[in-house]
């Protein structure tokens, strides 16, 4: 018997880290939970990384995802930003690995193509389509929408269910 695939998408950031949990079954995705962690940039980086790790641990324990999905880094404003973002991504990837959760990564172009149908779509178009695809009535923060978008992208890239065994 088929059961839904539960996907946890993460949009890593040094100021805000977005997350989105969806279930995908028989070609349809359903919103389970989403939000973002707003980090105080005045706090030392190790403290912010710990907060991301603890939040992700709690999300994994609560939602029991079958896989984790993260957007690949493609641009940084400065070398320092790239290094900090690399640390954040490392924490996210490590938490998935600690829990034995398979990790998948997609480029921004792949995500925009999967969600909007155009690889150079605007952020507002992605946000709009995420709300439509998930039949989500409320507003979504940008980081939250990005995390849901990467989760939906993965749902479109893999078989939509797993066999219970």
Name these PLM-found stretches.
Residues 1-165:
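Phosphate- and other anionic-substrate recognition elements at nucleic-acid/protein interfaces
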């Amino acid at each position: 018997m088929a059961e839904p695939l539960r996907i946890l998408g993460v949009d890593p950031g040094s100021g805000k880290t977005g997350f989105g949990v969806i279930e995908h079954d028989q070609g349809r995705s359903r919103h389970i939970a989403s939000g973002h962690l707003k980090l105080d940039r005045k706090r030392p980086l190790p403290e912010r990384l710990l907060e991301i790790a603890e939040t992700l641990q709690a999300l994994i324990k609560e939602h029991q995802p079958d896989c984790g999905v993260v957007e690949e880094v493609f641009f940084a404003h400065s070398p320092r930003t790239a290094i900090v973002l690399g640390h954040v991504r490392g924490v996210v990837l490590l938490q998935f690995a600690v829990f034995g959760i398979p990790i998948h990564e997609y480029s921004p172009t792949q995500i925009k193509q999967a969600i909007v149908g155009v690889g150079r779509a605007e952020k507002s178009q992605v946000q709009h389509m995420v709300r439509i695809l998930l039949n989500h009535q409320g507003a979504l923060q940008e980081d939250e929408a990005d995390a849901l978008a990467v989760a939906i992208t993965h749902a479109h890239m893999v078989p939509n269910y797993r066999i219970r065994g």
